[in-house]
Amino acid sequence: MGLCASSEKNGSTPDTQTASAGSDNVGKAKVPPKQEPQKTVRTVNTANQQEKQQQRQQQPSPHNVKDRKEQNGSINNAISPTATANTSGSQQINIDSALRDRSSNVAAQPSLSDASSGSNDKELKVLLLGAGESGKSTVLQQLKILHQNGFSEQEIKEYIPLIYQNLLEIGRNLIQARTRFNVNLEPECELTQQDLSRTMSYEMPNNYTGQFPEDIAGVISTLWALPSTQDLVNGPNASKFYLMDSTPYFMENFTRITSPNYRPTQQDILRSRQMTSGIFDTVIDMGSDIKMHIYDVGGQRSERKKWIHCFDNVTLVIFCVSLSEYDQTLMEDKNQNRFQESLVLFDNIVNSRWFARTSVVLFLNKIDLFAEKLSKVPMENYFPDYTGGSDINKAAKYILWRFVQLNRANLSIYPHVTQATDTSNIRLVFAAIKETILENTLKDSGVLQ
């Protein structure tokens, strides 16, 4: 089910601004002060839109997850979702069968051309926002797979240099982390300091699509397999240095990727990482006469000054948050907690005058990585008011609450737990988003009350 969170209007609606960094933010996200309940939560009943009614619920206490009341399952339904985490036998977030049912009902909805006069196609402007590495570009790649017949052979080939750069970046980050924490090479290790220095200084030729250099591949592969490296990336210092989220995936597939005649798979492309710079407009035909102009903009601080250029006439904002970032700091500012940065950004977006009449879809992304991390890195270390332990449902609901309670502008917020690298998950999520757009358009046109 979708969830609309609303609150009373606040006179102050700040425009989007760069989140400030401070030493007090290191490692922990700030806990909001306790306030009088003022929000209402209403559950959207898409099965019977003619009988829809608003159901109100008091804002849960911020100090104890266990004490939060979930009237009519409003928050719980938003979390039961949209994604199933592969947790290797541990807890899993349950799939909401009702969400599957509602995605199948989309075809039965009246088309937008029936609800509006003029053009047969309804063109919608959608902004894809969020901090760096929250999964925005991966979501856009999934939409290309789902609605634009995927990647051409030429496009697949063009991803080879990027994936090679990702492998090289992994090697360099491992070497830098070992140096920072004074991790010496094992006595029996065949690598030398010269090997590490050569890897650090190696420059991949531009647009290179041949075989990955064998000598550099040997260094990275050997380095990753060292017990001291594994202790470092899985130990208490893991959150203190940067390592791209897809590192385990790429190292698991390292031999295949560095072999002759390498051709990237769809999953290789989805797992690749490239910082978005600039503004990219992608047109997606969603069916039912809906065309979505999706604007993907860079999430790093240096890119956010460009956001203002695409704020006019926005129908929908999709805001991406990485669930697994709760113990991480920004790549561009090692003193700023990533989760705190996302909260500040979300606050500025939902309470901005630019989006006073805009709906917001909140993607709580990377549920798979979140499930793996939760049992290793207690959330209580970063959120003193969280008491849900390693229960993934309680943890996800807590994070959702932290975002929803910022909605002073009374916007409609539709949260989804997502795994952007899972095509079937994103297909299901966008079926639900499409239905939300249909419903809102029909209401605006007077077809629905």
Swiss-Prot record:
CDD domains linked to this entry: G-alpha (cd00066)
Low complexity composition bias: residue spans: 49-59
Entry PTM: Myristoylation at Gly-2 and palmitoylation at Cys-4 are required for membrane localization and function of the protein.
Compartments reported by the entry: Cell membrane
Segments for region (G1 motif): 125-138
Inhibition and activation profile: Alternates between an inactive form bound to GDP and an active form bound to GTP. Activated by the G protein coupled receptor (GPCR) GPR1, which serves as a guanine nucleotide-exchange factor (GEF), and inactivated by RGS2, acting as a GTPase-activating protein (GAP) for GPA2.
Protein name, as recorded: Guanine nucleotide-binding protein alpha-2 subunit
Species this protein is from: Saccharomyces cerevisiae (strain ATCC 204508 / S288c) (Baker's yeast)
Gene: GPA2
